[in-house]
UniProtKB/Swiss-Prot annotation:
The keyword Hydrolase applies. Its EC number is 3.6.1.41. This is Bis(5'-nucleosyl)-tetraphosphatase, symmetrical. Hydrolyzes diadenosine 5',5'''-P1,P4-tetraphosphate to yield ADP. Belongs to the Ap4A hydrolase family. Keywords: Hydrolase. Signal peptide: none annotated. Gene3D superfamilies: 3.60.21.10.
Amino acid sequence: MAHYFVGDVQGCFAELQRLLAKVDFNPSRDELWAVGDLVARGPDSLATLRFFQSLGDAGKIVLGNHDLHLLALHGKLKRDKPSDNLTPLLNAPDISSLIDWLRQQPLMRELPEHKVIMTHAGVPPQWSLEVLRQESLLVSQALKQNDYLDALISQMYTDTAERWDPSAIGINRLRFCINALTRMRYLYVDGHLDFDCKQPPEDCSNPQLRPWFEFTSTLRNSHILVFGHWAALMGKVDAPNLKALDTGCCWGEHLTLWHLEKDQKITQKKLKKS
């Protein structure tokens, strides 16, 4: 069995298929792990979701911020923007099935035998593995409830839950987990989240900000952390236990696949429109 990890697909389905063909991916023997943001901006979010749903146990995804936003769009909590290219997906006859499937997906996954942890944006340096498991489980449980739109999705859009508080309860606790695992890039020196700067570290002009992965973390020392979200990094992180896989395919760059067993990255350039 081979374990393949893919960066933010964001509807770039043709590039994904080219990439999987390069490694002769076979769902009967291999697993495809995806760092989230399966949808939005690229030309075929519908085919992308259908494909991952069809993989069954051979597909392992975590939710990204765009995937959570799709839940809000489907629930009529937000309006669809043409630039996101989500109208065909939202109008699809099987949209309810796809949404139900998406709601069953977690914010983190782990591969214990290889000491690999996958989230969309990263892991707060303050968190142990036990805390990560606990907090992501709370969000997953909320997503599976019948009132998930009112109780969670409608209340997740805020920049106020930027500081980890282990005594927080209810929606405030869930908000921090969502913000950290799906939106995080930089932290202030005191450890709270910044939501504004998206530049690569060499271009960040705020001396108070540091990338989340530059803070001391016992989890990062013991595990390989696989993440996406931060396209401006273009996969370049100077640390052996970090695998940054978002390489901006939907922005015209390329899609990246990481073969765990070979510790090898394979890429596919964005295809030109025919």
